[in-house]
Design a protein with these regions (language model features):
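Active-site acidic/histidine clusters and adjacent loop/turn architecture
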Residues: 1-36
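Catalytic cores and adjacent binding grooves of peptidoglycan-active enzymes
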Residues: 63-137
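Extended, low-complexity, intrinsically disordered C-terminal regulatory tails
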Residues: 26-55, 104, 112-114
Length: 137
């Protein structure tokens, strides 16, 4: 079975920088796990809402989701058994696929489960955003 993004994921992905679009499309084409792109560019009202709710640690315009004309971040959420899954294991599996591919095709990204980019993901973080992937320079 060949996986493909739905219309909403495609629309969200098209708001992101081309290297991220390329990475996410190739990650889906590997056919190891289905996933959706729930966000690319994030407008001010939504960034403010996420900050107030503790879902983001940064205010507008300091998130890589807030960069225009093309966002430097996407939220990629596993799609399992016909629905979005924020399950820890599903998110970590997807992150492994995306991070390995990012190294292979030289599109450096930082994952929201390893903000400090060390060799200890998740356990040494005080804020995990397991569906967040951003271009890293």
């Amino acid at each position: 079975m060949t996986l493909y993004f739905g219309k909403r994921s495609e629309a969200n992905l098209e708001t992101a920088a081309l290297p991220l679009q390329h990475l996410m499309r190739q990650a889906l084409a590997i056919n190891l796990i289905d996933f959706s792109i729930t966000e690319g560019f994030r407008p001010r009202f939504k960034q403010d809402e996420y900050f107030a709710a503790g879902k983001s640690k940064v205010r507008w315009p300091n998130s890589k989701h807030n960069i225009q004309p093309y966002s430097e971040a996407v939220d990629a959420v596993p799609y399992v058994r016909g629905k979005l899954s924020y399950n820890y294991y599903h998110c970590c599996f997807l992150a492994g696929v995306i991070l390995a591919l990012s190294k292979k095709i030289s599109v450096p990204v930082r994952w929201g489960g390893n903000w400090d980019m060390d060799l200890e993901p998740i356990t040494d973080q005080d804020f995990n955003d397991l569906v967040h992937f951003e271009l890293y320079k």
